[in-house]
From Swiss-Prot:
Matches recorded under Pfam families: ATP-synt_ab (PF00006), ATP-synt_ab_N (PF02874), ATP-synt_VA_C (PF22919)
Matching SMART domains: AAA (SM00382)
Protein name (database record): ATP synthase subunit beta
Subunit structure: F-type ATPases have 2 components, CF(1) - the catalytic core - and CF(0) - the membrane proton channel. CF(1) has five subunits: alpha(3), beta(3), gamma(1), delta(1), epsilon(1). CF(0) has three main subunits: a(1), b(2) and c(9-12). The alpha and beta chains form an alternating ring which encloses part of the gamma chain. CF(1) is attached to CF(0) by a central stalk formed by the gamma and epsilon chains, while a peripheral stalk is formed by the delta and b chains.
Summary of the function given for this chain in its UniProt record: Produces ATP from ADP in the presence of a proton gradient across the membrane. The catalytic sites are hosted primarily by the beta subunits.
Localisation per UniProt entry: Cell membrane
HAMAP family: ATP_synth_beta_bact
Matching InterPro entries: AAA+_ATPase (IPR003593), ATP-synt_VA_C (IPR055190), ATP_synth_F1_bsu (IPR005722), ATPase_a/bsu_AS (IPR020003), ATPase_alpha/beta_chains (IPR050053), ATPase_F1/V1/A1_a/bsu_N (IPR004100), ATPase_F1/V1/A1_a/bsu_N_sf (IPR036121), ATPase_F1/V1/A1_a/bsu_nucl-bd (IPR000194)
């Protein structure tokens, strides 16, 4: 499949007729020998209330007897049996190149913030593309410094890797993604592509306006398929955004950041489509090809020689159950996992990252250095010991602990609070400016706390500050 200008995809004259409509599933009959291939886009016009609009369908199955089963990517109001359907002769194509930056698109690549005639792009790429060949891949192990203490110290991100943000509803996944977009745009430049998959329309609007306000929109393309869209659209929006990102990586030779919010909605849409197509469900009602669908998306999000796509994916965990097949299938593809914890968020500690369950494959001396690794392990040991003592404290009280354990508990509470940090995107709510903490300062600050150098400071001084000097200043204000 090659890139084309929009007008050069030779339109076919093959037309069919709608034979059956069941919700978003449409069966279309074509002439003998003219069946469109799987994934081809079909177009039909409907008139409703005096207004004519185009509906796009995507071929999903060949049924026999010259029938294809397609999934509608638009609301299907107005579709009727016997209506004419045109085979476009190609899969869905989306615009690529510098012209997409600063604009909002739907899953079909249609701009939502400007008229299509004003979009200045020369090429359109099909959204169904093969993953890079094995000999083109490059495994990067360079750390991506975010300036967020808890992430840089305990779950360091890989430049060119896949990062998962796991958490239930309302623990801060979208806020953390917005924060990462802001930090990376401010500190690294480069191109970002955001895919809003099945999330709230309000959140999409907020994100667009915030990015406009912060001046990062000109280097970002946004692709949305929101909650009210048909399942076919929600299933394809991530592929549309990924195709735009692949162009920047492969043609313009740039490092790209791809944000997907929320990958669970991609799985959910696949489940809905699978049920509509009559497939037998598998575990917990998910589609039988769950791992295959996830693999087709994730294998394209990769680094090729010299250029990378770094992806950050928010992953909703249904009922906080990490054994659910949807989040469990995603785990296998990730280089780092950041788990957001409800108990931590209830303490008012943000970002609510669980330091004991979050992981990274590069938290290893050969990648991050011996000092970073040792400090991270000491922090985890203190926090783990504090966690183990909580039942004893709840039953007997903290006074019954040994002197050594009392010191560990008090130190752990300071570490917990010092893992919190003000966000740039939350400035308007908290009234406190966000802060970027260099990695060297993060390591030195946590090492000093673990060594007991700041045991004399009150716990509250460590909450929502940047480096340790800010905690000392806050302690002086609290004591005055």
């Amino acid at each position: 499949m090659t890139a084309t200008a929009e007008g050069t995809a030779a339109p076919t004259t093959v037309t069919g007729r709608i034979a059956r409509v069941i919700g978003p599933v449409v069966d279309v009959e074509f002439p003998v020998g003219s069946l469109p291939p799987i994934y081809n886009a079909l177009k039909t016009e409907v008139t409703l209330g005096g207004e004519t609009r185009t509906i796009t369908l995507e071929v999903a199955q060949h049924l026999g007897d010259n029938l294809v089963r397609a999934i509608s990517l638009n609301p299907q109001d107005g579709l009727v049996r016997g209506a004419e359907v045109r085979d476009t002769g190609a899969p869905i194509r989306v615009p690529v190149g510098d012209g997409v930056k600063g604009h909002v698109f739907n899953a079909l690549g249609e701009p939502q913030d400007i008229p299509k005639s004003e979009l200045q792009v020369k090429e359109y790429w099909p959204i169904h593309r093969p993953a890079p060949a094995f000999d083109q891949l490059e495994a990067k192990t360079e750390m991506l410094v975010t300036g967020i203490k808890v992430i840089d110290l305990l779950t360091p991100y890989v430049r060119g890797g896949k990062i998962g943000l796991f958490g239930g509803a309302g623990v801060g996944k979208t806020v953390l993604i917005q924060e990462m977009i802001t930090r990376i745009a401010r500190n690294f430049g480069g191109v970002s592509v955001f895919a809003g998959v099945g999330e709230r329309t309000r959140e999409g609007t907020d994100l667009f306006l915030e990015m406009q306000e912060m001046g990062v929109l000109p280097d970002t393309a946004l692709v949305f398929g929101q909650m009210d869209e048909p399942p076919g659209t929600r299933l394809r929006v991530a592929l549309s955004a990924l195709t735009m990102a692949e162009y920047f990586r492969d043609v313009q030779k740039q490092d790209v950041l791809l944000f997907i919010d929320n990958i669970f909605r991609f799985t959910q849409a696949g489940s809905e489509v699978s049920t509509l197509l009559g497939r037998m469900p598998s575990a917990v009602g998910y589609q039988p090809n769950l791992a295959d669908e996830m693999g087709l998306l994730q294998e394209r999000i990769t680094s090729t020689r010299g250029h990378s796509i770094t992806s950050m994916q928010a992953i909703y965990v249904p009922a906080d159950d990490y054994t659910d097949p949807a989040p469990a299938t995603t785990f296998a593809h990730l280089d780092a996992t950041t788990e957001l914890s409800r108990p931590i968020s209830q303490k008012g500690i943000y970002p609510a990252v669980d330091p004991l369950t979050s992981t990274s494959r590069i938290l290893d001396p050969q990648y991050v250095g011996q000092e970073h690794y040792e400090v991270a392990q000491r922090v985890k040991e203190i926090l783990q010991r504090n966690h183990d003592l909580q039942d004893q404290i709840a039953i007997l009280g903290i006074d019954e602990l040994s002197e050594e354990d009392k010191i560990i508990v008090h130190r752990a509470r300071r570490l917990e609070r010092f893992l919190s940090q003000n966000m740039f995107v939350a400035e308007k709510f908290t009234g406190t400016p966000g802060v970027f903490v260099p990695l060297e300062e993060t390591i030195a600050s946590f090492k000093a706390i673990c060594d007991g150098e700041y045991d004399h400071l009150p716990e509250q001084a460590f909450l929502n500050v940047g480096n340790i000097e800010m905690a000392v200043e806050k302690a002086k204000k609290l004591q005055s």
